[in-house]
């Protein structure tokens, strides 16, 4: 009898911390459990309660990035196994699509704006999040060849020429705004201030190709631009549970993208306004761009 009483007390005390699972029970639950349940059944019920509570975590109703961080601190497998993290986030999305999507976007924002991944990466976290062999070029958005979609705009050779002349390798995220209602109604905008240095001797081979003359450049100088990335809903392939891919360890968020570049110095302004070769960089749209949000989630909770 004494052993049974201890089990009942332990079970009821545990249920206090997980009340939502047992809401149908009345205030006399303790008495009913005592009168009608065998000791073996009590152990089974207690085990069920433990499992239900432990599995209800953030998957039941994910609403904030801090909630995800708390769960990750208690279950380190979430940060050590990307497939498990994708599975858990998919479950969270199925239970609360809007809340989970907002958390994923908040993780993207945190990684770029607050953690300043473009400016001062934590290399250990970067490798764990994005994978070994990855670089800033793999961050979305960025002012590199991939981030500016140079290969999609031009041939590979032309993209290389432009990158040799306009190499904006110092980046700072100045703003990151999110407006989200549902997969068909959202707007994410990121503003990056990008700077670079040039040496006339290094780029003079390409001057005529990009619409500049020798007199447009000093022997050395700087380039500066504001780059605005605006992400809008795609025409199809909207965000859904099917975008959580355990096999490839990815959470694919599809968008239509507009990239605008505004020159902040005379050389960059002239390139964007007068050079037929370069001016299409100033404003261009790209359809169905897929962004893997998983690395940003992982980077923000490590």
Curated annotation (Swiss-Prot):
Highest rank taxon of the organism: Bacteria
Entries under InterPro entries matching the protein: Lipoprotein_3
A Pfam family it matches: Lipoprotein_3
Alphabetized UniProt keyword annotations: Signal
Signal sequence segment: 1-52
Family to which this protein belongs: Belongs to the MG439/MG440 family.
Protein name, UniProt field: Uncharacterized protein MPN_643
């Amino acid at each position: 009898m004494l052993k049974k009483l201890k089990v009942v007390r332990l079970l009821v005390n545990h249920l206090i911390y997980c009340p939502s699972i047992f809401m149908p029970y009345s205030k006399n639950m303790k008495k009913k459990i005592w009168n009608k349940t065998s000791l073996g059944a009590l152990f089974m019920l207690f085990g069920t309660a433990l499992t239900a509570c432990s599995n209800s975590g953030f998957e039941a109703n994910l609403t904030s990035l801090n909630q995800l961080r708390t769960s990750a601190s208690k279950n380190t497998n979430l940060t050590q196994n990307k497939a498990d993290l994708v599975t858990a986030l998919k479950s969270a999305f199925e239970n609360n699509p809007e809340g989970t999507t907002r958390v994923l976007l908040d993780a993207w924002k945190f990684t770029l704006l607050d953690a300043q991944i473009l400016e001062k990466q934590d290399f250990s976290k970067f490798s764990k999040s994005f994978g070994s062999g990855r670089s800033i070029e793999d961050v979305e958005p960025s002012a590199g060849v991939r981030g500016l979609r140079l290969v999609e705009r031009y041939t590979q050779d032309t993209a290389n020429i432009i990158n040799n002349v306009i190499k904006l390798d110092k980046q700072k995220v100045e703003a990151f705004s999110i407006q989200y209602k549902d997969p068909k109604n959202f707007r994410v905008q990121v503003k990056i201030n990008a700077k670079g240095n040039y040496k006339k001797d290094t780029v003079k081979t390409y001057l005529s190709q990009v619409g500049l003359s020798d007199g447009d450049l000093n022997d050395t100088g700087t380039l500066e631009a504001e780059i605005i990335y605006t992400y809008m809903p795609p025409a199809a392939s909207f965000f859904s549970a099917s975008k959580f891919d355990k096999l490839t360890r990815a959470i694919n968020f599809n968008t239509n993208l507009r990239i605008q570049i505004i020159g902040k110095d005379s050389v960059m302004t002239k390139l964007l306004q007068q050079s037929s070769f370069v001016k299409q960089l100033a404003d261009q749209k790209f359809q169905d761009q897929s962004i893997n949000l998983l690395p940003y989630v992982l980077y923000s909770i490590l």
